[in-house]
Amino acid sequence: MIRVGLGFDSHEFREGIPLRIGGLTIPHTHGLSGHSDGDVLLHAITDALLGAVAAGDIGAFFPPSDPKWKGANSVVFIEEAMRHIETAGYRVGNVDCSLVLNAPKIGPHAKAIQESVAKLLKIEPTAVGIKAKTPEGLNLDGTALAHVVVLLEKR
């Protein structure tokens, strides 16, 4: 049996904070604001994983109203979501991710992001799709979005 999860997240760029995407720090003049580290990709993956096993969403597990999660590394969110899918008897088959942002260019970092996500999800890098698009005509210059679909397989 398989299950599919869909994840989405968005964060605004701000000066003075590091840019975290896929569990990595990416060199850039601005980072993504958020209650945690603002890792838009890991947040969308977390939502997709939790949704695939009908466990809720990232806000139910890590509410922004809880000071415990202020500045938290989003890797913790992925680890918790992975515990839920494993407890439900599933493993990740593959994940496909689209990042929507004007800058920085993701191409030079795509392989490192792919490897980081693969390690977190306990899959091969070839099972992780990382794509980047620009938000042409959408007036989203100061924002990054992530769209994710994940396929889970029964273990």
From Swiss-Prot:
Keywords from the named record: Isoprene biosynthesis, Lyase, Metal-binding
Reactions catalysed: 4-CDP-2-C-methyl-D-erythritol 2-phosphate = 2-C-methyl-D-erythritol 2,4-cyclic diphosphate + CMP
First-tier enzyme category under EC: lyase
Annotated cofactor note: Binds 1 divalent metal cation per subunit.
CDD domains referenced in this protein's UniProt entry, alphabetically: MECDP_synthase (cd00554)
A Gene Ontology BP annotation from the UniProt entry: isopentenyl diphosphate biosynthetic process, methylerythritol 4-phosphate pathway
An MF annotation (GO) of this entry: 2-C-methyl-D-erythritol 2,4-cyclodiphosphate synthase activity
NCBIfam families attached to this UniProt entry: ispF
Identification of the protein by name: 2-C-methyl-D-erythritol 2,4-cyclodiphosphate synthase
Organism listed in the record: Koribacter versatilis (strain Ellin345)
Name of the gene: ispF
